[in-house]
Design a protein with these regions (language model features):
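Generic structural signal for secondary-structure transition and capping sites
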Residues: 27, 38-39, 64, 133
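Acyl-donor (CoA/ACP) binding surface of acyl/acetyltransferases
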Residues: 1-27, 77-183
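A short helix-loop-beta-strand connector motif used in the catalytic cores of GNAT acetyltransferases and
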Residues: 59-75
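Hydrophobic pocket/interface hotspot
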Residues: 30, 52, 100
Length: 183
């Protein structure tokens, strides 16, 4: 397992769920899920295996030794099986805030969406607020999944902003919503 130089604690656990520094063995599962869920991601085209290899080799591999990486990514495990991934992205070390990114195995979305999101949020917030001492975390989302907002509100997030007609989606402009939590 790789380790993030910046973190004292690498693994966060809640019952049989955990987040661990992103595992290279999960890269093709992650690619599959991203391609299946491209509609709500800031990803312009499906990823190829070559794209994914390059991203892991050239971007992710370099994050582990950085003093202040722009992102901290984790494999989300249930009983040591990867069922999702995410982390803190667009980390602003000066202003002490970061965006939370998370996707899960597409097959789990229908029945375990709320559960997996809430557990992931609990784990990543522990890291964000208690390990790297951020003041604020937020979720940036295309206004396409209202069921996500309910989950965020259950996790004590508040609607921080609505960016009107902010992104083009299927030939029309849609809003972006930002849900935040302050330490």
């Amino acid at each position: 397992m790789k380790f993030y130089k910046i973190l004292n604690k690498q693994i966060y656990i809640s019952e049989n769920y955990s987040i661990v520094p992103i595992r290279f063995q999960d890269k093709f599962k992650i690619m599959k899920w991203r391609n299946e869920q491209i509609y709500h991601l800031r990803q312009s085209k499906p990823l190829s295996e070559e794209d994914q290899e390059n991203y892991f080799s050239n971007t992710i591999n370099n994050l582990f030794n950085q003093k202040q990486p722009a992102q901290l990514l984790f494999s989300f495990l249930k009983s040591n099986i990867c069922i999702g991934y995410g982390g803190l992205v667009n980390i602003n070390w000066n202003d002490k805030n970061a965006e939370i990114s998370f996707i899960m195995n597409t097959e789990l979305e229908e029945k375990e969406f709320e559960l997996n999101w809430l557990i992931f949020l609990k784990l990543i917030e522990d890291l964000a607020f208690n390990e790297i001492m951020l003041n604020k975390v937020y979720v940036y989302a295309f206004d396409l999944r209202p069921h996500l907002y309910r989950v965020l509100e259950l996790g004590d997030y508040f609607l921080d902003a609505r960016l009107k007609s902010h992104c083009k989606y299927e030939k029309k402009f849609i809003d972006v919503v930002i849900y935040s939590k302050i330490k």
